[in-house]
Amino acid sequence: MKFTELKIIEQGQGKWTVTIDGTEWTETLKKAKNRVLANLEVPGFRKGKIPAAQAEKYVTPSKIYNEAYRMMVSPAFDFARAQEVKVEPMNSPEPIPAKVSEKELVIEFLFDLKPEIKLGDYKNIKTVKKETVEVTKEEIEAVIDQYCEQFIMEKPKAADAKIEKGDIVTFDFKGFMNGEAFKGGEAKGHKLVIGSNQFIPGFEDSMIGLGLGEAKIDVTFPEGYTPELANKPATFELNIIEVKARELPKKDDELVKDLNLPNVETFAQFEAKVKEDITKQKLQNVKNQFVNDLINEIIKNSTIELPKTAIENQTADLRKEFEAQLKQQGLDIKKYKKVTGLSDEAIKAELTADAKNKLETYLVTSEIRSKEKFEVTEEAINAKFENLAAQFGIPADQIKTMVNPEMLKSEIVNDLLVDFLYSNNG
């Protein structure tokens, strides 16, 4: 293989060129032809059992070239990456077959150039403040209750008992709007914990005080619901079949034994562990928010000229992600605009701003990493494996076979960056 690189300053793009020729290309074409033959489908013959004379009629040079190109894209990229590259890409290079012939294959990898930035101050910044972390008794109780859910007892209530918050209710329901049933508003034998907020606001509260048998409740669908129902009143006909009370286990040492948590034997130790876990999570959230705000401050103090193509490409990627998220919610752009009242221009402006911030964040953090030269030690890698093993309940040796080492190192470097920025600012 031969490698060249070209810097296209005017367009803010770079290009790597890799040429495959000689024996390497000849051998690749032979392998490509064999692959095409092996996967060839001809009416009247089984795949891989087609007589050579018949097969040759269907194997065109373009099919062989296309297969050979697919075979060489990844090796060519690895070859280009292994060179002492002067041109630094900011995104994933896009491969293009510039020339394909019997003599050679030329692949071009196009990418946005990583712009030179003038990094502002990133230490001793006092304008971003750190929040203090406090854990309340109520928060500890809420987490303990979640643990208790594993051992909850369900006891049927008396026939004349009324529904209370926390009860488990089995019921049929059918929704009506303007006197007509609507799609998706009906179910039989549905089981619901009152107060779990599984239904729209007001639905579960309206069930409190009801008894067994038939009843009606009136609700209004919230603003962010599907366009067909958003902000509209509806009536639900209910048939309450069964009401059960939820009985939590006693919060004592016996509960702790049932939980079988490592290094926790008494309820007092359990409470301490819960408080410690909440504190760690809150501290991590505070730290992440602080660093996000800090990075935005560093961006303001830095000089960055983003290539127009980089912003456009990143905006397009965010648009695809956004549309995919809408699809998961049963929406599309048209329905989203109707619900929110936003125009195409407003949506594009928001996505463009997000794209710009994402690119600037990448460049600023990349520059800080480069300057500080964070070192990933074996101890840090092993500690990360142990944490993952504890988190998922899988042996560390098994985790090592499941996790990409480079991605793990990247995570560790990011953790080091966050810790560094948090410790040296505020």
UniProtKB/Swiss-Prot annotation:
<keyword id="KW-0413">Isomerase</keyword>
<dbReference type="GO" id="GO:0006457">
    <property type="term" value="P:protein folding"/>
</dbReference>
<dbReference type="InterPro" id="IPR008881">
    <property type="entry name" value="Trigger_fac_ribosome-bd_bac"/>
</dbReference>
<comment type="function">
    <text>Involved in protein export. Acts as a chaperone by maintaining the newly synthesized protein in an open conformation. Functions as a peptidyl-prolyl cis-trans isomerase.</text>
</comment>
<dbReference type="GO" id="GO:0015031">
    <property type="term" value="P:protein transport"/>
</dbReference>
<dbReference type="InterPro" id="IPR001179">
    <property type="entry name" value="PPIase_FKBP_dom"/>
</dbReference>
<dbReference type="Pfam" id="PF00254">
    <property type="entry name" value="FKBP_C"/>
</dbReference>
<protein>
    <recommendedName>
        <fullName>Trigger factor</fullName>
        <ecNumber>5.2.1.8</ecNumber>
    </recommendedName>
</protein>
<keyword id="KW-0131">Cell cycle</keyword>
<feature type="domain" description="PPIase FKBP-type">
    <location>
        <begin position="166"/>
        <end position="249"/>
    </location>
</feature>
<dbReference type="InterPro" id="IPR027304">
    <property type="entry name" value="Trigger_fact/SurA_dom_sf"/>
</dbReference>
<dbReference type="Pfam" id="PF05697">
    <property type="entry name" value="Trigger_N"/>
</dbReference>
<dbReference type="GO" id="GO:0003755">
    <property type="term" value="F:peptidyl-prolyl cis-trans isomerase activity"/>
</dbReference>
<dbReference type="InterPro" id="IPR005215">
    <property type="entry name" value="Trig_fac"/>
</dbReference>
<comment type="similarity">
    <text>Belongs to the FKBP-type PPIase family. Tig subfamily.</text>
</comment>
<keyword id="KW-0697">Rotamase</keyword>
<dbReference type="GO" id="GO:0051301">
    <property type="term" value="P:cell division"/>
</dbReference>
<dbReference type="InterPro" id="IPR036611">
    <property type="entry name" value="Trigger_fac_ribosome-bd_sf"/>
</dbReference>
<dbReference type="GO" id="GO:0005737">
    <property type="term" value="C:cytoplasm"/>
</dbReference>
<dbReference type="InterPro" id="IPR008880">
    <property type="entry name" value="Trigger_fac_C"/>
</dbReference>
<dbReference type="InterPro" id="IPR046357">
    <property type="entry name" value="PPIase_dom_sf"/>
</dbReference>
<dbReference type="InterPro" id="IPR037041">
    <property type="entry name" value="Trigger_fac_C_sf"/>
</dbReference>
<keyword id="KW-0132">Cell division</keyword>
<dbReference type="Pfam" id="PF05698">
    <property type="entry name" value="Trigger_C"/>
</dbReference>
<keyword id="KW-0143">Chaperone</keyword>
<keyword id="KW-0963">Cytoplasm</keyword>
